[in-house]
Design a protein with these regions (language model features):
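Conserved cytochrome P450 K-helix E-x-x-R motif and the immediately C-terminal K′/meander segment
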Residues: 1, 258-297
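Cytochrome P450 substrate-recognition site 1
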Residues: 2-70, 134-145
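Conserved cytochrome P450 K-helix/beta-meander segment immediately N-terminal to the heme-binding cysteine loop
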Residues: 30, 310-337, 345
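Cytochrome P450 heme-thiolate monooxygenase catalytic core
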Residues: 74-236
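Cytochrome P450 catalytic-core helices
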Residues: 220-224, 231-257, 354-386
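Residue-level recognition of short, solvent-exposed, well-ordered loop/turn junctions
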Residues: 300-303
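Cytochrome P450 heme-thiolate "Cys pocket" and heme-binding signature region
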Residues: 331-408
Length: 423
């Protein structure tokens, strides 16, 4: 029986639930994406929804923006500074301690790095940052409307209105300024100047290599995707990590001293992503006959047939994650051939391009190096600031096909110490 909170578009569709089966589904060239069909006005021909050679070319085009060197530069120049000034803005609550909704706080932290990756200008002020968040939120909900359990029509309508504002107020001014710079460099024959713009941000990258088959809205949709992807999934996952670690430290008080240890926090981050995948399921459509092995059965598909990959179930496959697969354990032992984060980042050619942004060097199994990714950087800073739940509070899940919380208030006991060091 399928769960009640399963998104409507996944109901009644043959389902792949094993870890190996979902990996095979994601890697198969006989299947194409069918997840974002209702939200197509927000995702048409973005890197998330295209397949085959077009996807390969787009991924190669955009990869330099998320290279290791680029991400380390983002972390040094933007992330750490942004984390601290966002923490500094948290207002005192009824008890006199800084208190806020954690999801909103992290979303704000990640909005600036997302805007930098996209190449949006003039979002550093509190007013412009807040306006960007105002237009991003309804677009984000519309982009993943397939997972919503409420009426979809008003969600899409609000998203389209916000998308127009996003184009007019943010993307178009940045596009015009950057296009003028590129045109001037080309007219001057300044090859070095043009090369220096390669990989600096999404808008520059797409304008430098513009494809005449793209419609004029293509840059808006791709920018929207990156803005959402850089913040939504990570902010949700970090709230889950804080919740899971709260329970872990309560059961294992001797491990509270590990709350600032990067290796421990990275394992906790990946275990959280395994248990609370940003995307619970994906939908694929067969373009040619194909068979997918799933546990002890084989699912046979003909062209046009739909099949879903249950990311959440695959990441709980006992044959890969052992006994106690349903519980949070940052010390879980798994085979080297299994991703510690399960199927959370997808796989095959559609593996999440932002995986290294989130997990740093650990995204490729490397445990050495200074780049830890945004997940651990933010999580460790929260614990340095003494994050905890308000007294007698337990977070409640939202009524949604996405695994998220409705509200997530937190209190900080040691904020002054953190901010005094930052100054």
């Amino acid at each position: 029986m399928q769960p009640e909170n399963l998104p409507p578009f996944l109901r009644g569709v043959p389902e792949i639930t094993s870890y190996d089966g979902v990996k095979a589904l994601l890697k198969s060239s006989a299947l194409e994406s069918a997840t974002h069909e209702e939200s197509i006005d927000f995702g048409r021909r973005t890197i998330l929804t295209i397949d085959g050679e077009e996807h390969f070319d787009r991924r190669r085009l955009e990869a330099p923006m998320l290279s290791r060197d680029a991400l380390k530069a983002y972390e040094r120049s933007i992330l750490v500074k942004t984390i601290d000034h966002c923490l500094a803005d948290v207002a005192p609550g009824p008890q006199g301690l800084p208190e806020c909704d954690l999801s909103e706080l992290i979303t704000r932290m990640l909005l600036e790095i997302g805007a930098t990756i996209v190449g949006l200008d003039d979002v550093e002020t509190a007013e412009r940052s807040e306006r960007l968040r105002e237009v991003r939120d309804p677009m984000m909900r519309a982009f993943i409307v397939e997972f919503e359990l409420e009426d979809h029509e008003p969600i899409i309508a609000e998203g389209l209105t916000a998308k127009d504002a996003f184009r007019d107020e943010f993307v178009q001014p940045s596009r015009e300024r950057r296009q003028a710079e590129i045109d001037a460099l080309r007219e001057a024959g300044d090859t070095a100047g043009l090369e220096a713009l390669e990989g600096t941000n999404l808008i520059n990258q797409m304008l430098l290599h513009w494809d005449d088959s793209w419609d004029d809205d293509m840059l808006v949709r791709e920018s929207l995707l990156y803005l959402i992807a850089s913040g939504h999934s990570t902010s949700t996952a970090i709230t889950h990590a804080v919740n899971e670690l709260s329970g872990w430290f309560e059961a294992h008080p001797e491990e509270y001293e590990l709350r600032l240890d990067a290796d421990f926090l990275m394992n906790a981050a990946m275990e959280t992503l395994r248990l609370h995948s940003p995307t619970p399921g994906i939908l694929r459509r067969a373009v040619e006959p194909v068979e997918i092995a799933d546990h002890d059965r084989v699912v046979s598909l003909q062209p046009g047939d739909l099949v879903s990959g249950n990311i959440a179930a695959a990441s709980r496959d006992e044959s890969h994650f052992g006994e106690g697969w349903a519980s949070f354990n940052p010390h879980r032992e798994i085979a080297r051939t299994t991703n510690r984060y399960g199927a959370a980042f997808g796989g095959g050619t559609h593996v999440c391009i932002g995986r290294q942004l989130v997990l740093g060097n650990y995204a490729r199994g490397e445990k050495e190096g200074e780049y830890f990714g945004v997940f651990v950087r933010i999580l460790r800073r929260l614990y340095e600031a003494g994050i905890r739940f308000p007294d007698s509070f337990k977070p409640q899940p939202a009524h949604s096909g996405h695994d998220r919380f409705e509200h997530f208030p937190v209190v900080f006991d040691d904020m002054d110490a953190v901010l005094s060091v930052a100054r």
